[in-house]
A protein has these predicted regions:
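A hydrophobic, helix-centered structural microdomain
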Residues: 58-129, 172, 237-238, 243-259
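Membrane-embedded multi-pass helical conduit in multi-pass membrane proteins
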Residues: 1-50
Length: 259
Protein backbone atom coordinates (compact mmCIF):
# COMPACT_ATOMS: atom_id res chain seq x y z
CA UNK A 1 0.00 0.00 0.00
CA UNK A 2 2.83 2.40 0.79
CA UNK A 3 4.36 1.86 -2.66
CA UNK A 4 0.94 2.33 -4.27
CA UNK A 5 0.27 5.54 -2.32
CA UNK A 6 3.67 6.94 -3.30
CA UNK A 7 2.56 6.90 -6.95
CA UNK A 8 -0.73 8.75 -6.47
CA UNK A 9 0.71 12.25 -7.14
CA UNK A 10 2.06 11.00 -10.46
CA UNK A 11 -1.32 9.47 -11.30
CA UNK A 12 -3.16 12.71 -10.56
CA UNK A 13 -0.77 14.70 -12.79
CA UNK A 14 -1.19 12.15 -15.59
CA UNK A 15 -5.00 12.38 -15.34
CA UNK A 16 -4.95 16.18 -15.49
CA UNK A 17 -2.62 16.19 -18.50
CA UNK A 18 -4.26 13.40 -20.52
CA UNK A 19 -7.40 11.52 -19.48
CA UNK A 20 -6.50 8.58 -21.75
CA UNK A 21 -3.18 8.12 -20.01
CA UNK A 22 -4.88 8.69 -16.67
CA UNK A 23 -7.20 5.72 -17.27
CA UNK A 24 -4.31 3.22 -17.52
CA UNK A 25 -2.23 4.90 -14.83
CA UNK A 26 -3.84 2.95 -11.91
CA UNK A 27 -2.86 -0.35 -13.53
CA UNK A 28 0.70 0.89 -14.07
CA UNK A 29 0.90 2.09 -10.48
CA UNK A 30 -0.41 -1.24 -9.23
CA UNK A 31 2.21 -3.13 -11.25
CA UNK A 32 4.89 -0.76 -9.95
CA UNK A 33 3.77 -1.24 -6.36
CA UNK A 34 3.73 -5.04 -6.80
CA UNK A 35 7.25 -5.09 -8.26
CA UNK A 36 8.67 -2.80 -5.58
CA UNK A 37 6.92 -4.71 -2.83
CA UNK A 38 8.18 -8.05 -4.11
CA UNK A 39 11.71 -6.71 -4.36
CA UNK A 40 11.52 -5.29 -0.85
CA UNK A 41 10.18 -8.56 0.52
CA UNK A 42 12.88 -10.67 -1.10
CA UNK A 43 15.52 -8.25 0.07
CA UNK A 44 14.29 -8.43 3.65
CA UNK A 45 14.21 -12.22 3.59
CA UNK A 46 17.78 -12.36 2.27
CA UNK A 47 18.88 -9.86 4.91
CA UNK A 48 17.28 -11.85 7.71
CA UNK A 49 18.86 -15.08 6.47
CA UNK A 50 22.35 -13.63 6.12
CA UNK A 51 24.93 -14.75 8.62
CA UNK A 52 26.76 -11.92 10.40
CA UNK A 53 29.74 -10.72 8.39
CA UNK A 54 33.04 -11.85 9.82
CA UNK A 55 35.27 -9.11 11.07
CA UNK A 56 38.43 -8.53 9.05
CA UNK A 57 41.16 -10.91 10.17
CA UNK A 58 43.62 -8.08 10.73
CA UNK A 59 42.67 -4.66 12.01
CA UNK A 60 43.69 -1.61 9.98
CA UNK A 61 46.54 -0.82 12.37
CA UNK A 62 47.79 -4.41 12.23
CA UNK A 63 47.70 -4.41 8.43
CA UNK A 64 49.63 -1.13 8.33
CA UNK A 65 52.31 -2.27 10.78
CA UNK A 66 52.70 -5.63 9.05
CA UNK A 67 53.03 -3.96 5.66
CA UNK A 68 55.62 -1.47 6.93
CA UNK A 69 57.63 -4.35 8.40
CA UNK A 70 57.37 -6.23 5.10
CA UNK A 71 58.61 -3.26 3.07
CA UNK A 72 61.51 -2.46 5.38
CA UNK A 73 62.54 -6.09 5.86
CA UNK A 74 62.29 -7.03 2.19
CA UNK A 75 64.19 -3.98 0.98
CA UNK A 76 67.04 -4.39 3.46
CA UNK A 77 67.21 -8.14 2.81
CA UNK A 78 67.35 -7.65 -0.96
CA UNK A 79 70.29 -5.28 -0.61
CA UNK A 80 72.11 -7.50 1.87
CA UNK A 81 71.51 -10.66 -0.17
CA UNK A 82 72.52 -9.17 -3.53
CA UNK A 83 76.06 -10.68 -3.59
CA UNK A 84 74.74 -14.09 -2.50
CA UNK A 85 71.97 -13.95 -5.10
CA UNK A 86 74.51 -13.29 -7.86
CA UNK A 87 76.57 -16.27 -6.71
CA UNK A 88 73.47 -18.49 -6.66
CA UNK A 89 72.50 -17.37 -10.17
CA UNK A 90 75.97 -18.24 -11.46
CA UNK A 91 75.89 -21.66 -9.76
CA UNK A 92 72.51 -22.47 -11.32
CA UNK A 93 73.73 -21.58 -14.81
CA UNK A 94 76.88 -23.67 -14.41
CA UNK A 95 74.99 -26.66 -12.97
CA UNK A 96 72.22 -27.09 -15.54
CA UNK A 97 70.69 -25.58 -18.64
CA UNK A 98 67.63 -23.39 -18.32
CA UNK A 99 66.66 -20.08 -16.73
CA UNK A 100 67.96 -18.91 -13.37
CA UNK A 101 64.52 -18.00 -12.07
CA UNK A 102 61.38 -20.10 -11.86
CA UNK A 103 58.04 -18.28 -11.99
CA UNK A 104 54.79 -20.01 -11.12
CA UNK A 105 51.18 -19.04 -10.41
CA UNK A 106 50.38 -19.28 -6.71
CA UNK A 107 47.28 -18.39 -4.72
CA UNK A 108 47.45 -15.37 -2.45
CA UNK A 109 45.14 -13.47 -0.13
CA UNK A 110 41.42 -14.02 -0.73
CA UNK A 111 42.17 -16.53 -3.49
CA UNK A 112 43.86 -14.06 -5.84
CA UNK A 113 46.60 -15.56 -8.00
CA UNK A 114 50.02 -14.01 -8.41
CA UNK A 115 53.33 -14.88 -10.07
CA UNK A 116 55.72 -16.20 -7.43
CA UNK A 117 59.44 -15.97 -8.14
CA UNK A 118 62.06 -18.47 -6.98
CA UNK A 119 65.51 -19.58 -7.97
CA UNK A 120 65.14 -22.62 -10.22
CA UNK A 121 65.97 -25.81 -8.34
CA UNK A 122 64.66 -28.39 -10.83
CA UNK A 123 65.22 -29.42 -14.40
CA UNK A 124 63.50 -27.11 -16.94
CA UNK A 125 60.63 -29.53 -17.74
CA UNK A 126 59.91 -30.43 -14.11
CA UNK A 127 56.22 -29.52 -14.31
CA UNK A 128 55.67 -31.90 -17.22
CA UNK A 129 57.38 -34.73 -15.35
CA UNK A 130 55.22 -34.34 -12.23
CA UNK A 131 52.35 -36.39 -13.66
CA UNK A 132 54.75 -39.29 -14.22
CA UNK A 133 55.88 -39.28 -10.58
CA UNK A 134 52.57 -38.95 -8.76
CA UNK A 135 48.91 -39.62 -9.53
CA UNK A 136 47.49 -36.17 -8.88
CA UNK A 137 43.89 -37.33 -9.33
CA UNK A 138 44.16 -39.78 -6.43
CA UNK A 139 45.39 -37.32 -3.79
CA UNK A 140 43.44 -37.70 -0.55
CA UNK A 141 44.50 -34.23 0.61
CA UNK A 142 45.42 -31.05 -1.30
CA UNK A 143 49.13 -31.60 -0.70
CA UNK A 144 51.91 -33.90 -1.82
CA UNK A 145 55.52 -34.59 -0.89
CA UNK A 146 58.26 -36.13 -2.97
CA UNK A 147 61.30 -37.06 -0.94
CA UNK A 148 64.31 -37.59 -3.15
CA UNK A 149 62.56 -35.89 -6.07
CA UNK A 150 64.59 -36.85 -9.19
CA UNK A 151 63.74 -33.53 -10.84
CA UNK A 152 65.82 -31.55 -8.35
CA UNK A 153 69.27 -30.52 -9.58
CA UNK A 154 72.47 -30.75 -7.54
CA UNK A 155 72.57 -27.04 -6.82
CA UNK A 156 68.81 -27.06 -6.37
CA UNK A 157 69.01 -29.61 -3.58
CA UNK A 158 71.44 -27.41 -1.68
CA UNK A 159 69.32 -24.31 -2.22
CA UNK A 160 66.17 -26.08 -1.04
CA UNK A 161 67.81 -27.47 2.07
CA UNK A 162 68.63 -23.98 3.30
CA UNK A 163 65.65 -22.21 1.66
CA UNK A 164 67.99 -20.08 -0.46
CA UNK A 165 65.77 -20.68 -3.49
CA UNK A 166 63.17 -18.43 -1.88
CA UNK A 167 65.29 -15.26 -1.81
CA UNK A 168 63.64 -13.83 -4.98
CA UNK A 169 60.31 -13.92 -3.15
CA UNK A 170 61.47 -10.71 -1.48
CA UNK A 171 60.36 -9.09 -4.75
CA UNK A 172 56.89 -10.58 -4.22
CA UNK A 173 56.87 -9.10 -0.72
CA UNK A 174 57.75 -5.64 -2.05
CA UNK A 175 55.02 -5.98 -4.69
CA UNK A 176 52.44 -6.76 -2.00
CA UNK A 177 51.69 -10.29 -3.19
CA UNK A 178 53.35 -11.89 -0.18
CA UNK A 179 54.39 -11.08 3.36
CA UNK A 180 57.56 -11.94 5.23
CA UNK A 181 55.42 -14.12 7.51
CA UNK A 182 52.23 -15.96 6.65
CA UNK A 183 50.80 -19.27 5.44
CA UNK A 184 52.66 -21.14 2.74
CA UNK A 185 51.73 -19.99 -0.81
CA UNK A 186 50.11 -22.93 -2.58
CA UNK A 187 49.78 -23.88 -6.22
CA UNK A 188 46.50 -23.07 -7.94
CA UNK A 189 45.52 -26.66 -8.72
CA UNK A 190 45.96 -27.66 -5.07
CA UNK A 191 43.77 -24.81 -3.83
CA UNK A 192 40.99 -25.98 -6.14
CA UNK A 193 40.82 -29.10 -3.96
CA UNK A 194 40.30 -27.10 -0.75
CA UNK A 195 37.17 -27.36 1.34
CA UNK A 196 35.70 -24.35 3.14
CA UNK A 197 37.80 -24.82 6.26
CA UNK A 198 41.01 -25.14 4.29
CA UNK A 199 40.23 -21.98 2.31
CA UNK A 200 40.34 -20.01 5.55
CA UNK A 201 44.12 -20.04 5.29
CA UNK A 202 43.76 -17.65 2.33
CA UNK A 203 42.51 -14.84 4.58
CA UNK A 204 45.96 -13.22 4.79
CA UNK A 205 48.92 -12.81 2.45
CA UNK A 206 51.10 -15.92 2.13
CA UNK A 207 54.54 -15.66 3.67
CA UNK A 208 58.15 -16.46 2.89
CA UNK A 209 58.22 -18.09 6.29
CA UNK A 210 55.48 -18.94 8.70
CA UNK A 211 54.26 -21.25 11.45
CA UNK A 212 54.80 -24.28 9.22
CA UNK A 213 58.45 -23.47 8.56
CA UNK A 214 59.36 -23.14 12.24
CA UNK A 215 57.40 -26.20 13.39
CA UNK A 216 58.63 -29.05 11.21
CA UNK A 217 58.54 -27.71 7.64
CA UNK A 218 57.88 -30.52 5.17
CA UNK A 219 57.70 -33.18 7.89
CA UNK A 220 54.27 -31.93 8.99
CA UNK A 221 51.05 -33.53 7.80
CA UNK A 222 48.62 -31.25 5.99
CA UNK A 223 46.26 -31.35 8.99
CA UNK A 224 49.04 -30.26 11.34
CA UNK A 225 50.10 -27.49 9.00
CA UNK A 226 46.54 -26.26 8.55
CA UNK A 227 46.00 -26.15 12.31
CA UNK A 228 49.16 -24.09 12.82
CA UNK A 229 48.29 -21.66 10.03
CA UNK A 230 44.69 -21.14 11.14
CA UNK A 231 45.86 -20.53 14.71
CA UNK A 232 48.34 -17.95 13.38
CA UNK A 233 45.56 -16.17 11.47
CA UNK A 234 42.96 -16.27 14.22
CA UNK A 235 45.36 -15.08 16.93
CA UNK A 236 47.48 -12.76 14.84
CA UNK A 237 49.87 -10.36 16.56
CA UNK A 238 52.87 -8.50 15.17
CA UNK A 239 55.06 -9.93 17.90
CA UNK A 240 54.27 -13.43 16.59
CA UNK A 241 55.66 -12.38 13.22
CA UNK A 242 58.84 -11.20 14.92
CA UNK A 243 59.14 -14.45 16.88
CA UNK A 244 58.64 -16.54 13.73
CA UNK A 245 61.27 -14.51 11.86
CA UNK A 246 63.78 -15.07 14.67
CA UNK A 247 62.97 -18.80 14.86
CA UNK A 248 63.36 -19.14 11.09
CA UNK A 249 67.11 -18.44 11.21
CA UNK A 250 68.19 -21.53 13.21
CA UNK A 251 65.59 -23.69 11.46
CA UNK A 252 66.98 -22.76 8.03
CA UNK A 253 70.57 -23.27 9.17
CA UNK A 254 69.75 -26.80 10.37
CA UNK A 255 68.26 -27.58 6.95
CA UNK A 256 65.80 -30.20 8.19
CA UNK A 257 62.38 -30.94 6.72
CA UNK A 258 63.01 -29.24 3.37
CA UNK A 259 62.14 -31.22 0.23
Amino acid sequence: LAFLASGLPFGWKAWRKDHAVGLVTPFMLAARALALGAGYGVGMLRFLNLEPQERPVLKARQRLMKRLMDLAGALLSLIAAAPLSLAIALAIKLDSSGPVLYVQDRVGVNGRTFRMIKFRTMVPDADKQLGELIDLASLEEPVFKLKGDPRVTRVGGFLRRFSLDELPQLINVLAGDMSLVGPRPEETWLVRLYNDQQRRRLAVRPGMTGPMQVNGRGDLTFAQRLQLELDYIEHYALRRDLVILLKTIPVVLRGRGAY
